[in-house]
């Protein structure tokens, strides 16, 4: 019976959260070409979550939202909130680029891929999310092997002063508060936001009642200010994020450990519009500090400490030769430091878009000169057909692209005495083919899309341990081929009923590289607006079986396991009392399903969040 119910819900459309909208204005995105473009006309299928979409997920985490995106697997998403979250997109392993307001945000203290820790980001400060699947190194450089995620922070108000406040509480002794104030004074605009969250949590490691809870707390403060003129705008932005959390020794192993992560950043953005194009300057400096401590005797004592700094600067120009030819070209510089180690890179890139009636061709190339491994070329070609049929559209495209992943400072320089340096470590490279098709309404009230892809990876990073000295080192040890397909469906049946979802499939020739990655995933949802100001959202998630492994401290060996598939049902209810006040209730894992996300670590049982928002 349960299988019939699950199948019925899944067949309501191969279901996806992505982009259910009823606005008549066609939304525009910047992620596909680095400049504003109607989302339907981009060469690849782009996922857009507007503020209206994110309203459905109040009180949840960013990983909760990304879990609903096609072919996204956020490992650790269903464990204790303080546990690490790994983004696995289309079978990749954290090889994504995260942008904040169009500018890369990186953490150079990480072991691999320098991906920002998404635990530091609160949904309360996010206006919208744009996602571009597939290799995108031509526009975004290293790490853009499987996806680019652009997180747009809250917009400034057009009033002189506007303020909002929110608070929530729920299971595991979790309480959070957020506030923001923004406004516009003539040509000047500003926005300040703050966030605080504390939780008793649950035991990170799976075990008996003697395992203590691993709580956490997070604080964030963000600010931006700028000026807006007719043909020029400039803004400064900065922020501080803090995450203090307890964690256990490992799978099935309790412990008294504490992590203390801090991130600070300062950046700027300037845009100059002229008759035939736009000139853009992006800069950002970020500093990350990570401290790990273990409780020994009667106090916490430091076990490790890393500090990393990243400086990024980019200047690019979009020029429209005419309505049929557009060229975007630019320069990029990045410098990374961690403790005493450092590397830098200088990039030049160009990307052109040619249009003739319904035929389009996007092609580009990038040259990266890296202080560690020299020159690296990447290139892409994306021919596609786009035709509007009244209020509808249809698009069919093919893309061919290369991408690369630079070794991190940790992988290149090691961490003595445990990890040896490898000065000969080369970048990991990939070659991707993709065919995509989409059909729907231009206002996105109906959207059907599908994609099939094949990605060949070479010089994949691997960690090798010497069996005699037990010292480790990172090497280029393997190659692999990943293939899969994905389907999205979203339909706004009436002004009060919408449904949709997604199905994704991915597999690798080297099955050992599929650790913690399912072959199949299904998301589905139905949204109902029963009364004025009311919203009811019911969602379903299916995650297929996965291979996993853990270190057994009793046998001093690694044990491999196969994790069972699982289904989760969630519900969200919200009520707008008046234009200023609203309430919401989230119910997760309604059926109280027992399941495993990561072997040896506790997953969340039935839980809830209740909250309110007030706008002054």
Question: PLM ranges: what are they?
Answer:
Residues 289, 371-377, 383-434, 452-477, ...:
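Surface-exposed extracellular loop regions of Gram-negative outer-membrane beta-barrel proteins
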Residues 86, 104-133:
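Short acidic/polar hinge/loop motifs at secondary-structure boundaries
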Residues 153-183, 194, 209-214:
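Short strand-turn segments of transmembrane beta-barrel domains in outer membranes
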Residues 253-269, 273, 399-457, 465-492, ...:
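Outer-membrane beta-barrel signature, preferentially recognizing the C-terminal barrel domain
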Residues 38, 63, 67-104:
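Extracytoplasmic beta-strand/coil segments of soluble accessory domains associated
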Residues 323, 355, 454-456, 475-551, ...:
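Gram-negative outer-membrane beta-barrel transporters
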Residues 120-164:
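A beta-strand signature from Gram-negative outer-membrane beta-barrel systems
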Residues 199-206, 211-220, 231-310:
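Flexible loop and strand-edge segments within Gram-negative outer membrane beta-barrel domains
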């Amino acid at each position: 019976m349960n299988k019939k119910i699950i199948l019925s819900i899944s067949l309501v459309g191969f279901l996806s959260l992505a982009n259910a909208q009823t606005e008549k204005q066609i939304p525009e995105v910047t992620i596909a070409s680095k400049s504003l473009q109607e989302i339907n006309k981009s060469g690849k299928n782009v996922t857009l979550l507007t503020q209206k979409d994110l309203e459905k997920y109040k009180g949840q985490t960013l990983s909760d939202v990304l879990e609903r995106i096609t072919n996204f697997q956020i490992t650790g998403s269903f464990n204790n909130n303080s546990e690490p979250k790994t983004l696995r997109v289309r079978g990749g392993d954290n090889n994504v680029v995260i942008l904040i307001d169009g500018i890369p945000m990186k953490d150079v203290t990480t072991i691999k891929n320098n991906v920002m820790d998404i635990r530091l980001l609160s949904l309360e400060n996010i206006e919208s999310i744009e996602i571009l699947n597939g290799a995108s190194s031509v526009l975004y450089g290293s790490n853009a092997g499987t996806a680019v995620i652009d997180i747009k922070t809250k917009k400034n108000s057009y009033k002189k002063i506007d303020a909002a406040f929110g608070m929530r509480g729920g299971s595991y002794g979790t309480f959070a508060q957020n506030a923001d104030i923004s406004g516009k004074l003539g040509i000047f605009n500003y926005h300040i936001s703050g966030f605080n969250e504390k939780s008793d949590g649950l035991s990170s490691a799976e075990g008996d009642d003697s395992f203590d809870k691993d709580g956490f707390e997070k604080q964030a403060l963000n600010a931006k200010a700028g000026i807006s003129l007719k043909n020029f705008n400039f803004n400064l932005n900065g922020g501080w994020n803090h995450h203090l959390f307890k964690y256990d020794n490992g799978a099935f192993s309790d412990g008294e450990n504490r992590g203390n992560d801090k991130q600070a950043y300062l950046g700027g953005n300037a845009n100059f519009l002229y008759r035939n194009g736009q000139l853009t300057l992006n800069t950002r400096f970020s500093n990350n500090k990570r401290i790990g401590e273990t409780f020994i005797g009667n106090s916490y004592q430091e076990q490790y400490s890393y500090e990393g700094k990243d400086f990024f600067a980019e200047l690019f120009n979009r020029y429209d030769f005419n309505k049929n030819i557009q060229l975007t070209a630019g320069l990029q510089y990045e410098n990374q430091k961690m403790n005493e180690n450092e590397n830098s890179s200088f990039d030049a890139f160009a990307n052109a878009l040619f249009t003739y009636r319904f035929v389009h061709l996007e092609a580009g190339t990038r040259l990266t000169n890296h202080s560690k491994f020299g020159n690296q070329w990447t290139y892409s070609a994306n021919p596609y057909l786009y035709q509007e049929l009244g209020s509808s559209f249809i698009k069919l495209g093919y893309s061919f692209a290369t991408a690369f992943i630079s070794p991190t400072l940790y992988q290149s320089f090691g961490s003595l005495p445990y990890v040896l340096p490898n000065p000969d470590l080369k970048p990991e490279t990939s070659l991707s083919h993709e065919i995509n098709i989409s059909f729907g309404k231009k206002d996105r009230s109906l959207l059907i899309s599908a994609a099939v892809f094949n990605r060949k990876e070479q010089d994949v990073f691997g960690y090798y341990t010497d069996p005699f000295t037990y010292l480790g080192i990172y090497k280029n040890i393997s190659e692999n081929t990943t293939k899969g397909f994905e389907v999205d469906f979203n339909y706004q049946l009436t002004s009060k009923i919408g449904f949709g979802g997604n199905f994704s499939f991915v597999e690798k020739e080297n099955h050992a590289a599929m650790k913690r990655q399912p072959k199949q995933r299904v998301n589905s949802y139905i949204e109902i607006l029963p009364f004025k100001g009311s919203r009811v959202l019911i969602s379903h998630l299916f995650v297929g079986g996965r291979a996993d492994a853990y270190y057994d401290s009793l046998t001093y060996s690694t044990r491999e396991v196969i994790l069972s598939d699982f289904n989760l049902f969630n519900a969200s209810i919200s009520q707008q009392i008046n234009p200023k006040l609203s309430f919401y209730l989230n119910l997760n894992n309604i059926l109280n399903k027992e399941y495993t996300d990561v072997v040896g670590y506790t997953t969340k049982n039935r839980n809830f969040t209740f909250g309110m928002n007030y706008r002054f």
